[in-house]
């Protein structure tokens, strides 16, 4: 199974974008969850505006689907500036980055998603731009080549990544603000589902919102996607009204259990129990057993399973916890 094809994948899909733009909060006061990040950013933004400075460069990291792009857009809105958006894989040439930097207005935001995938050549251009607001450009070729410096207006670089550890130290050290986004609580996700339903003019009960939230793996992107699929079911089965019963039936149809697991999650956990006697099992063996890339397991599947206490990542390998045995109705084996 391709990770992006899963209904509970936290990776953005093309059909998510239009709806996400419609329901995405624009200001910090509408931003639900991440209380520490929100309170810190309120102070940092207000201070920058009082000093009439650009906000310090900001690195946002955490699992996919938690709102890194949303937060970047909120920062630009709160600062009252424009935002230019790109991603690490798109910036193939130094000239691509130079063109974006030279078109920025004072205090504008340049948002680079997947910043850990920048090439070394692009990073070399970024260093003086971030530190001194200067751009070094090579003119000519061969022996006649020379470097010229261009002054840039003060700007804010916001980098987003799911793999902060993959950033080089020189790049990471140039971010004055670093924020980690955590998985959301069920209470916060319930609020997000209710807010999204209101934006989409949907009728949904409080307990139905809670039902969607608790199966959303702590991730707003998944919650909003599940809400749209539950809406489809409600339109056909209940004249559009989303009750708890309708939500449960829709999610059962989608094969999403009460822990928010789909077939792939259950396959990973059951493989550890059945094929490897509960673990420990190495990542390569586990990837081969379930037919997925090791990066998919490490970056997409594991964070939620570990955070929820279903999986342990140890130096000797992955181990299924007693909670996993109970989830599969194998509580007796938890004491082996």
From Swiss-Prot:
One of its GO terms (biological process) is DNA recombination. One of its GO terms (cellular component) is cytoplasm. DNA binds at residues 294, 313, 318. ATP binds at residues 23-24, 65, 68-70, 131-133, 174, 184, 221. Its EC number is 3.6.4.-. Has 3 domains, the large (RuvB-L) and small ATPase (RuvB-S) domains and the C-terminal head (RuvB-H) domain. The head domain binds DNA, while the ATPase domains jointly bind ATP, ADP or are empty depending on the state of the subunit in the translocation cycle. During a single DNA translocation step the structure of each domain remains the same, but their relative positions change. This is Holliday junction branch migration complex subunit RuvB. It comes from Actinobacillus succinogenes (strain ATCC 55618 / DSM 22257 / CCUG 43843 / 130Z). The gene is ruvB.
């Amino acid at each position: 199974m391709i990770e992006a094809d899963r209904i509970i994948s936290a990776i953005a899909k093309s059909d998510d974008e239009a709806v996400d733009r419609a329901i995405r909060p624009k200001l910090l006061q509408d931003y639900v969850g991440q209380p520490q990040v929100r309170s810190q950013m309120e102070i940092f933004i207000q201070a920058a505006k009082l000093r009439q400075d650009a906000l310090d460069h900001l690195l946002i990291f955490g699992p996919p689907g938690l709102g890194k792009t949303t937060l970047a857009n909120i920062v630009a809105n709160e600062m009252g500036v424009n935002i230019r958006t790109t991603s690490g894989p798109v910036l193939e040439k130094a000239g691509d980055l130079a063109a974006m930097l030279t078109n920025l207005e004072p205090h504008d935001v340049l948002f680079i998603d997947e910043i850990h995938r920048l090439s070394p050549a692009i990073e070399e251009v970024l260093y003086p731009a971030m530190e001194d607001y200067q751009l070094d450009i090579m003119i000519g070729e061969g022996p006649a080549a020379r470097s010229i410096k261009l002054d840039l207006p003060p700007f804010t670089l916001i980098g987003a990544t799911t793999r902060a550890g993959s950033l080089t130290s020189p790049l990471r050290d140039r971010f004055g603000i670093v924020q980690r986004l955590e998985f959301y609580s069920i209470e916060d996700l319930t609020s997000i589902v209710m807010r999204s339903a209101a934006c989409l003019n949907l009728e949904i009960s409080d307990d139905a919102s809670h039902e969607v939230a608790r199966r959303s793996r702590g991730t707003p992107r998944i919650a909003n996607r599940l809400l749209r699929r539950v809406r489809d079911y409600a339109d056909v089965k209940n004249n559009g009204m989303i009750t708890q019963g309708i939500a449960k039936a829709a999610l059962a149809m989608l094969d999403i259990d009460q822990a928010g697991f789909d077939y792939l999650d259950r396959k990973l956990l059951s493989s550890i129990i059945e094929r490897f006697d509960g673990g420990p099992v190495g990542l390569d063996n586990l990837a081969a057993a379930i037919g997925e890339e090791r990066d998919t397991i490490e970056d997409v599947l594991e964070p939620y399973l570990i955070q929820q206490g279903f999986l342990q990542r140890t130096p000797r390998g992955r181990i299924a916890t007693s909670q996993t045995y109970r989830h599969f109705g194998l509580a007796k084996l938890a004491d082996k």
